[in-house]
């Protein structure tokens, strides 16, 4: 038990040091959603009318609507960046040393997931603080209530990145696959538009959005900001996390997985 805790703290410390040393990564993580919030929202404010739907009790501005989606976007990019570092570590050989330690492999990978989730949560709260300074804020209780939602969403997206990293053996291939996953997952979700708005354009797109795990992660954050729980979204996120993690652990198993030659 003590060894497992030491392992967790060591990996969190390692990821934190790596994050601090990569200032450009932090800057990009904050600037990217701010550009969407300031520029994109201003352009689409008049074009996208929003009806009153849970968790909202009154009409809201488009800026308020997309904040949960931008929080999810931060965690999505953070999860993929963390997985990119896994591919790099595997190419450099440090992953082999880590995975051959006496600590169970599944715990090592979970520690990596948890560390990347903590970093993504720090980025989200930094973004929310800046958004609050721009006049787009929420209640103090809402900021506290989203923490469990951010943890679950971060773990789910981190597990997805872990799954992708278990299938890719070369660093140069990961960027293309990462973009192939990130952008469809983000745009085909409720991050930017509500489901009913998507249904007006295409029922097929609406169904894709409804089955997208990222949509449910965004809705979990959205409801949590108002002190509510979207139970369907919660079940989806937990289920997706379990599936992604299970396949990832299988992929990193040297006897059965997809990276046995590299790990």
Which residue ranges define each predicted feature?
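Short hydrophobic, aromatic-rich alpha-helical segments embedded in or entering the lipid bilayer
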Residues: 3-13, 191-235
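Short amphipathic alpha-helical coupling elements at transmembrane boundaries
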Residues: 10, 14-18, 93-100, 169, ...
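Transmembrane helix-boundary elements of multi-pass transport/secretion proteins
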Residues: 15-92, 124, 136-146, 176, ...
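Transmembrane alpha-helical core positions of polytopic small-molecule transporters
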Residues: 33, 61, 65, 69, ...
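Transmembrane helix segments
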Residues: 42, 46-48, 165-211, 215
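Hydrophobic alpha-helical interface/terminus motif in multipass membrane transporters
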Residues: 43-44, 86, 95-98, 130, ...
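Helix-loop-helix units of permease transmembrane domains in multi-pass membrane transporters
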Residues: 85-117
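Alpha-helical transmembrane segments and their short interhelical loops
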Residues: 105-179, 228-251
């Amino acid at each position: 038990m003590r060894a497992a805790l030491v392992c967790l703290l060591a990996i969190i410390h390692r990821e934190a040091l790596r994050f601090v040393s990569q200032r450009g990564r932090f800057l990009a993580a904050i600037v990217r959603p701010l550009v969407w919030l300031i520029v994109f929202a201003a352009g689409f404010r008049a074009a996208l009318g929003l009806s009153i739907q849970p968790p909202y009790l009154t009409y809201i501005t488009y800026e308020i609507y997309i904040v949960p989606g931008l929080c999810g976007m931060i965690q999505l990019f953070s999860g993929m960046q963390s997985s990119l570092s896994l591919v790099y570590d595997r190419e450099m050989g440090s992953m082999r040393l880590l995975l051959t330690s006496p600590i169970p492999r599944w715990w090592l990978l979970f520690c990596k997931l948890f560390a990347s989730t903590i970093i993504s949560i720090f980025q989200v709260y930094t973004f929310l603080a800046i958004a609050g300074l721009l006049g787009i804020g929420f209640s103090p209780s809402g900021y506290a209530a989203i923490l469990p939602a951010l943890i679950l969403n971060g773990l789910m997206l981190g597990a997805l990145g872990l799954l992708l990293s278990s299938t890719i053996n070369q660093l140069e291939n990961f960027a293309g696959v990462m973009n192939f996953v990130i952008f469809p997952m983000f745009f085909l979700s409720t991050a930017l538009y509500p489901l009913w708005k998507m249904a007006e354009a295409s029922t097929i797109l609406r169904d894709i959005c409804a089955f997208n795990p990222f949509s449910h992660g965004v809705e979990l954050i959205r409801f949590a900001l108002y002190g509510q729980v979207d139970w369907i979204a919660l079940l989806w996120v937990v289920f997706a996390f379990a599936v992604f993690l299970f396949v990832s652990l299988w992929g990193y198993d040297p006897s059965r997985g997809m990276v046995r030659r590299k790990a």
